[in-house]
Amino acid sequence: MKVRNSLKSLKNRHRDCRVIRRRGRTYVINKTNRRFKARQG
């Protein structure tokens, strides 16, 4: 999982990337290709 300040470029890496908020943190997850995971922080 990558930790980045800005998730805008990370959500454009793949067509299926979704931005999710969990427990006050923002994540990018991808169900089809799980290597595109990131957390903001």
Curated annotation (Swiss-Prot):
An individual GO BP term: translation
Molecular functions per Gene Ontology: structural constituent of ribosome
Keyword Ribosomal protein annotated: yes
Ribosomal protein in keyword set: yes
Domain of life: Bacteria
Annotated keywords: Ribonucleoprotein, Ribosomal protein
GO cellular component: ribonucleoprotein complex; ribosome
Pfam short name (any one): Ribosomal_L36
Signal sequence segment: none
Family indicated by similarity: Belongs to the bacterial ribosomal protein bL36 family.
NCBIfam families: PRK00831.1 (NF002021), rpmJ_bact (TIGR01022)
Protein name: Large ribosomal subunit protein bL36
Source organism: Erythrobacter litoralis (strain HTCC2594)
Organism taxonomic ancestry: Bacteria, Pseudomonadati, Pseudomonadota, Alphaproteobacteria, Sphingomonadales
